[in-house]
Amino acid sequence: RPGRFDRQIIVPLPESDERLAILKVHSIGKRMGQDVDLDTMAKATPGMSGADLANLVNEAALFAVRRGSTHIERIDFENARDRVVLGASRESLVLNAEEKRATAYHEGGHAVLATVLPHSDPLHKVTILPRGMALGVTWTLPAERHTYSREFFEDVICKAMGGRVAEMMVFGSLNSGAANDLEQATGIARRMVREWGMSDAVGPMAWSGQQQVFLGEDLMTSGREYSDETARKIDEEIGRILLEQEK
């Protein structure tokens, strides 16, 4: 609180160049294979702290030991990153042939859109090996950005919808596998409309939904800063964005 400390030091998470430097430090003394590209791994680990990156290198070394190798290869870093971010592989999970096929087409839908959309981050890896709660994952290499355009968010939503659309095109029906994609897409569309002023119909207004009084929302109000008409318009705009990007 004010008065106890005169200086407030903000330590942000490392960016790509800084992550590369951290990975190099923790790789000292470890034998690296010829295919290891720490620069690519630095780009593929946004949001990781220095401790996370140290753990990543240690996990990669453990994967190499389990393979009986004297060198850490690229596959070890990939497996380590998947484990740190998603969790351990679920070898006990047995999918039937139809589920594997659906997962493959689902991730393929994401991958195709990541490749062709002009504002999407470049495709890095696609897997249908179950890890954590995911049956498959499509990885991209995000650029270091500090501001984001409406077109970028639209492409993120479109890519999220890609798995669902691919399943519909191939199987003619939908399943519950797109739940996380829909949650991500809806969350982005909601913030585009409510917080970032990216809806022409609603206009340049922002409602974060985080303004609360002491001990919770003011009991004398509904906790909402806008009218029922505006709420209806917001819902319509969120739905419009999602449907447009699904097409």
Describe the function of each predicted region.
Residues 102-104, 111-247:
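Soluble catalytic regions of large protease machineries
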Residues 92-102:
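Short pre-active-site segment immediately N-terminal to the catalytic Zn-binding motif
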Residues 47, 104-105:
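Alpha-helical architecture
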Residues 1-11:
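A short helix-turn-beta junction within AAA+ P-loop NTPase domains corresponding to the substrate/partner-engaging
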Residues 1-3, 24, 118, 141:
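Short, glycine/charged-enriched secondary-structure capping and boundary segments
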Residues 11-78, 83, 87-88, 160-168, ...:
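Conserved C-terminal "switch" segment of AAA+ ATPases
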